[in-house]
From Swiss-Prot:
InterPro entries cross-referenced by the UniProt entry: AddA, DNA_helicase_UvrD-like_C, DNA_helicase_UvrD/REP, P-loop_NTPase, PDDEXK-like_dom_sf, PDDEXK_AddAB-type, Restrct_endonuc-II-like, UvrD-like_ATP-bd
Recorded name of the encoding gene: addA
Pfam families assigned: PDDEXK_1, UvrD-helicase, UvrD_C
Binding site for ATP: A25, G26, A27, G28, A29, G30, K31, T32
Gene Ontology molecular function terms on file: 3'-5' DNA helicase activity; 3'-5' exonuclease activity; ATP binding; ATP hydrolysis activity; double-stranded DNA binding
UniProt keyword ATP-binding present: yes
GO CC entries: cytosol; DNA helicase complex
Assembly and binders: Heterodimer of AddA and AddB/RexB.
Disulfide partners: none
GO BP field: double-strand break repair via homologous recombination; recombinational repair
Naturally occurring in which organism (per UniProt): Clostridium botulinum (strain Hall / ATCC 3502 / NCTC 13319 / Type A)
Protein name: ATP-dependent helicase/nuclease subunit A
Catalysed conversion reaction: Couples ATP hydrolysis with the unwinding of duplex DNA by translocating in the 3'-5' direction; ATP + H2O = ADP + phosphate + H(+)
Ranges of residues in domain UvrD-like helicase ATP-binding: 4-499
Length: 1279
């Protein structure tokens, strides 16, 4: 059925059957299309069709499941169009609604709901909110600690003394973190107990035979390979230099020693040889003909190797068996106590959930696992009867994004797949054994494997969620590519997304830096991406750009003097990079004039000008960087949106509302109270707040207000307040002297607060918050501020959070505030509300993780000079899923504390795994680009850094693994790989690098390395400041009183510039401004255009809000932008589209009333609507900028002087569409029409510039121009 031309490899992935099939699909390889096609071929097979509900398809997200279901539905529908009588197709279309295409969590929930009777859970269970779970966990751990303190549990007390700080919160954090970590293990109690038992060693313990010892040896061998390269490089220099051949023998001995170590497989031998080795002394011969530079160079290299070997000796010397044994024996009680403490906590937390009939997200997988597994008499984990039923039911189990599976999910999938074998614990680790097991009931078709797994281990970036890429890698290394095998793999590495320039660059870089050590996979030619996309020859691809700037660049005194600034005023590093990126974007986009980048539009099937929406800025993390980048881009007039997960709780409107809720709960909190008092909710001035505080400095601010309130109201003070008042007469005098307006203000606020406190008890929290929005007018006030739409959206999010909270098992304002605080600190804040649609023409800033699965014409990867986050390595107890616990050794009696030897091993292992994850994250970032890739980063001391890069270029094919292991930033990897590339020659010359490179790589990838000048960016900042300062000076002079200098000041200020008229010409005009200018030229009396400005109340203070004509026009334009004409056959369809905009909060219900479905339908059924429907190229709300002569607008200017003056016209075209013989331009108008000719004259000039913009941007002829008038439901053609 599919018209797609599949590659041979794709066909293998689609049609191979009767085996376990692993599909390794590189970035852009079309894995989703292949997976969908495989399903379609299965259900429409003419020989043995499989009903779609007999397939289990597991996806990573709900969106992916929905997309897959939609694609399959489209394919079936297309088949029915071709064969309407097909019973098979009709059946599959019916079964599609109950198909098992879902996320792993959805499948687990299905299993639980169908088999709840086998578990001790209520069938009406609810999945608890994440923050509700956090609150319950905190309750559980507080209660558990209190109980253990009360009974004075000795193990617990020792644990607190060893691993808690002054408070026990640090130990609580350890327990909560270990609990979360353990839940990624299939049988978490077993894992916890096994990891503690690793410390329970006897006299026979031999560290040299443990996995830890092997790990130390393998890690050190990576470094030794680096030392080997350095020594080999030195020997090459000795043999090719004059007069230093006497160095050859000692260097050869050193190299033999390193080679011998690399061949060792026994830790004991390895350790012994390193400790025993003494470097031979270098001969002290003097040879006047010796090449001194070469001699010094090899000595330096050898000294470096010697120093590193001494460090390894010292480390290995500490790994003495008896010492390690004593450490283990000492730590065992604490580690056992820790495991037991986590188990006790889990049981208490489970009890709390059961009381409320709740389960959390971890429970979903673990409950499913317990339903699907049994243990046989030998203790092996085998499928339960329920799992066997699923094995019979599912003809095939298909798993998407397999590289992101964790071990719990892997065991679950193995239980419902037809695989031979069982799971069992070996040395504390759960492992799969592919052996025959005896099942009481013979398994149907067990001999025919039925598992399909697709993913890309190079894109496994969710280790922080306990994803285990080793699951994929183990199969990838074991499975065969040969046909007919039971376990087979297929490789899809042809990339159908990116230009060859992007692919070649990605391949070059990762061949240089990715390995089994860092990245967990060797990036060989076999693993490399292959070019599959065709972009034609019309527009040539561009090289990948690397834009670097030295953040420690010293600014000379001359420069500081020239620009009159202090060095401290220089832009900070993030600002610098943000400004650099803004400049790159400006150059890429241009002003829709000449010079902008052209990109291929898949929908149009042709090249067009680059738009802002085509660009994404990717960052490793957006929390601190994105807001600064947004500011820098906005300064350059670049529309931008940052998709962040932070900043929400720092917005003024949310801080104010949370402060209000805090004082309603408890007004005796000075900081939130003052926040509310200074806000528009209460509007107290600083002077008024000082007057209130003067009542008494020793009590809370609210108590001061309460005293004023009571005395002013002639109420008697109770004993509590009397206690704090030493001199009541003095207080009375203060209050008597107080401004009457202030006293009334205080009384009004106190009374409101008391009313709010009372009301908060009687209504749900979500209703109460909305009541406060309306009662205080704060929601309306926020909307009237700059970025009001965003602020109101943030307030709605708080309301939604309250609604979510109201459904939990917690009630009341106090608990809601705790709920918000836990959300703030445990979930790492949240991003502000999203108010932009997917098609808005803005540059997007997002994290690399959020970009996974997406693609963009232009990708800018920024922040590559930022250090990797290794803060987790500093915790006092580390956890590793395979190696277990890595605690500090803490002896409270002797007051000794240091990292245990096993902690150092685990710390290094986690560091390597983190670096591997960072490597894959970098791969994901670079493979998002379709046509253009730009990398930006700041370097600390450019000259030294580049010199270090050059020293790592001895191997042209690979950056040394030890160098990659020691990398702290992405640039530490990218730099050494690129510095030896042929395209780096000019960059090295620019830096005056004299070192000769013998290993220049002549690779087909194309790179452009730019060194950006910090001085130029500093200059721009100074120029901005000069404008601001001149405005302030002008303002100061305007306020000068009469003085002896009046005449001189007047004379200087009255100076008239020769081209003064030009200064009044704006550099940019909107089309509306142009229209007004032409009307002004025609009217002698401008009174109608510029009426007296009348101040009016903000909308939120008015009793009734009426939508203005301009707002009405905006709403209708917004609806027309989002109108889908294909789904607008009747008024009900129109209403449904209106409701969708309301749901997505693009418009409110009140605003929706101005959209008349009947009028919209008339447009859709009219001639223009039909023509739009028939067009294959329809564009809406297209912004533009075009350059025109200033004389064209300002005809009064001197033609000779201003003949070369230009200005930019900006506007937004409502709609244009393409027909065979040209473009059709359409502009919507909601004005009331008296005279058709008047309307034509009014908008003629506007349409003229729209036409000119379209001509320039598209290069195509505009054949027709129309105004559609909604007031009369008709259109006017503009000649």
């Amino acid at each position: 059925m599919s018209g797609t031309k599949w590659t041979d490899e794709q066909r293998q992935a689609i049609f191979t059957k009767d085996c376990n099939l692993l599909v390794a699909a590189g970035a852009g390889a079309g894995k989703t299309a292949v997976l969908v096609q495989r399903i379609i071929e299965k259900i429409l097979d003419k020989g043995e069709p499989i009903d779609i509900d007999k397939l289990l398809v597991v996806t990573f997200t709900n969106a992916a499941a929905a997309e897959m279901r939609e694609r399959i539905g489209d394919a079936i529908s297309k088949g029915l169009d071709e064969d309407p009588e097909s019973k098979v197709l009709r059946k599959q279309l019916t079964l599609l609604n109950k198909s098992n295409i879902m996320t792993i969590h959805s499948f687990c929930l299905q299993v639980i709901k169908n088999n709840f009777h086998t578990m001790e859970i209520d069938p009406n269970f609810r999945i608890c909110d994440e923050t509700e779970g956090i609150l319950m966990k905190q309750e559980a751990i507080d209660e558990l600690f209190d109980e253990l303190y009360e009974i004075e549990n000795e193990d617990f007390i020792n644990l607190v003394e060893s691993y808690a700080s002054r408070k026990d919160t640090r130990l609580q954090e350890v327990v909560l973190e270990l609990h979360r970590f353990a839940k990624s293990a299939p049988f978490s109690y077993d894992w916890l107990l096994n990891m503690a038992e690793e410390f329970n060693v006897g006299e026979e313990f031999n560290f040299e035979e443990t996995p830890w010892a092997d790990m130390i040896m393998e890690d050190m061998k990576v470094l030794l390979h680096g030392f080997k390269n350095m020594l080999q490089q030195s020997i090459d220099v000795i043999l090719n230099s004059e007069g230093i051949d006497y160095y050859y023998e000692p260097f050869k001995m050193d190299l033999s020693f390193i080679n011998s170590l690399l061949e060792k497989s026994s830790f004991k031998e390895f350790r012994g040889e390193i400790i025993a080795y003494d470097f031979p002394k270098l001969p002290l011969k003097r040879n006047k003909d010796a090449d001194k530079e070469a001699k010094e160079r090899v000595k330096k290299l050898r000294d470096k190797v010697k120093k590193k070997i001494v460090e390894l000796k010292n480390i290995l010397d500490s790994y003495e068996n008896e010492f390690i044994k004593k450490e283990f024996i000492f730590l065992y009680p604490s580690m056992k106590a820790l495991s037991n403490l986590v188990i006790l906590f889990d049981k208490k937390y489970e009890a709390k959930k059961r009381e409320r009939d709740l389960i959390d997200f971890n429970d979903i997988e673990h409950l499913c696992l317990s339903i699907l597994t049994d243990k046989n008499s030998e203790g092996h984990i085998i499928p339960s009867d329920i799992a066997l039923d699923y094995r019979k039911k599912f003809a095939e189990v298909l798993i998407d994004e397999y590289q992101d599976s964790n071990l719990v999910q892997e065991v679950i999938m193995s239980m419902v797949s037809r695989v031979k074998g069982y799971w069992s614990f070996y040395n504390g680790q759960l492992m799969f054994n592919e052996e025959e097991i005896n099942l009481e009931e013979p398994q149907i078709c067990l001999d025919i494997p039925n598992r399909f797994m697709v993913g890309d281990v190079k894109q496994s970036i969710y280790r922080f969620r306990q994803a285990k890429p080793e699951i994929f890698l183990d199969k990838y290394n074991e499975y065969s590519e040969e046909e007919g095998t039971k376990n087979r793999k297929v490789k899809l590495f042809k990339n159908f997304r990116s230009r060859k320039e992007v692919i070649n660059g990605v391949n070059y870089l990762f061949k240089q830096i990715m390995s089994k050590t860092i990245g967990e996979l060797d990036y060989t030619e076999e693993e490399a991406l292959k070019v599959g996309a065709s972009y034609g020859e019309e527009v040539k691809g561009e090289p990948i750009e690397l834009c670097l700037m030295d953040k420690k660049y010293e600014i000379s005194e001359e420069v500081l003097k020239e620009y009159n600034v202090d060095e401290e005023e220089a832009l900070d590093n993030i600002q610098l990079e943000g400004r650099l990126v803004a400049k790159k974007i400006q150059k890429l986009v241009g002003n829709n004039l000449e010079g902008g980048l052209k990109v291929f539009d898949k929908k149009l099937g042709e090249y067009r000008n680059l738009q802002y929406r085509d660009i994404v800025i990717l960052m490793r993390a957006t929390s601190n960087w994105a807001p600064i980048f947004v500011e820098e881009l906005a300064k350059e007039g670049i529309p931008v949106f940052a998709d962040t997960n932070s900043g929400y709780f720092d917005t003024a409107e949310i801080k104010t509302m949370i402060s209000l809720l805090q004082i309603i709960d408890n007004p005796l909190q000075d900081i939130p109270l003052l926040s509310v008092l200074r806000s528009p909710i209460a509007s107290f001035t600083d002077d008024e707040l000082i007057d209130i505080r003067m009542v008494n400095k020793n009590i809370t601010f609210y108590e001061c207000m309460e005293i004023i309130y009571r005395l002013y109201k002639n109420e008697k003070l109770d004993s509590y307040y009397s206690f704090y008042i030493e001199d009541e007469n003095k207080i009375n005098k203060i209050i008597k002297d107080m401004n009457e307006k202030l006293k009334n203000k205080i009384c009004s606020f106190i009374e409101k607060l008391k009313l709010w406190r009372e009301k908060s008890i009687h209504i749900d929290i979500d209703e109460f918050i909305w009541f406060l929005y309306v009662e205080t007018g704060y929601y309306g006030y926020a909307g009237a501020l700059q970025a009001g739409e965003q602020r109101q959206a943030n307030l709605r999010i708080l309301f939604q959070r309250a609604k979510q909270y109201a459904k939990t098992s917690y009630k009341g304002l106090f608990n809601f505030i705790n709920f918000i605080n836990k959300l703030k600190f445990s979930s790492g804040d949240m991003g502000s509300a999203k108010i932009l649609g997917e098609n808005e023409n803005v540059v997007r800033i997002m994290s690399i993780h959020k970009s996974k699965g997406l693609e963009f014409p232009v990708v800018i990867l920024s922040g590559t000079g930022k250090n990797f986050n290794m803060t987790d390595l500093n915790k006092n107890i580390l956890f590793h899923r395979d190696l277990g616990y890595g605690p500090d050794y803490v002896d409270t009696e002797r007051r000794i504390a240091y990292p245990s030897l096993v902690k150092n091993i685990i710390k290094n292992k986690i560091r390597l795994e983190t670096l591997s994850e960072e490597m894959r994250i970098l791969y994901v970032a670079l493979t998002r680009a379709r046509e253009k890739l730009i990398i930006t980063g700041l370097i600390n001391n450019m000259d030294k850094t580049v010199e270090d890069w050059l020293n790592l270029s001895e191997d042209k094919n690979k950056v040394p693994e030890y160098a990659v292991m020691s990398g702290k930033t992405y640039l530490d990897w990218i730099g050494p790989a690129l510095i030896k590339h042929k395209d780096a020659v000019s960059f090295r010359e620019e830096l005056k690098m004299t070192s000769e490179l013998s290993n220049i790589v002549d690779d087909k990838s194309k790179w452009k390395i730019e060194l950006w000048n910090k001085r130029e960016l500093l200059k721009e900042k100074v120029e901005e400041d000069e404008v601001e300062i001149s405005e302030k000076i002008k303002e100061t002079l305007m306020n000068l009183e009469e003085s002896n200098y009046k005449e001189e000041i007047y004379k200087r200020l009255s100076f008239k510039y020769k081209y003064d008229n030009a200064s009044s010409i704006p550099t940019k005009l909107s089309v509306s401004d142009v229209k007004k200018q032409f009307i002004l030229d025609e009217k002698e009396n401008t009174e109608e255009l510029f009426k007296k400005l009348e101040l009016r109340k903000p909308m939120f203070m008015e009793e009734k809000k009426k939508i203005s004509p301009s707002e009405r026009g905006t709403i209708i334009h917004l609806f027309m932008q989002h109108l889908d004409l294909k789904k607008a056959e009747n008024e009900e369809d129109i209403k449904e589209q209106i409701n969708r905009l309301i749901e997505r909060e693009f418009i409110t219900y009140e605003q929706s009333k101005v959209i008349n479905p009947y009028k919209i339908l008339k447009f859709c059924r009219g001639e223009l609507g039909k023509r739009i429907l028939n067009s294959n190229n329809v564009n809406k709300e297209m912004p533009f900028s075009i350059e025109i002569p200033a004389l064209e607008i300002y005809k009064e200017l001197d033609k000779e002087i201003y003949k070369d003056e230009k200005l930019i016209i900006q506007g937004v075209i409502d709609c244009y569409f393409e027909e065979e013989d040209g473009l059709v331009l359409l502009d919507y108008k909601t004005d009331y029409v008296n005279d058709i000719e008047e309307i034509k004259n009014r908008y003629e000039i506007q349409i003229k510039y729209y036409e000119e913009a379209l001509n320039r941007i598209t290069g195509k002829n505009v054949k027709d121009k129309y105004l559609y008038l909604f007031s009369v439901d008709n259109y006017i053609k503009i000649d």
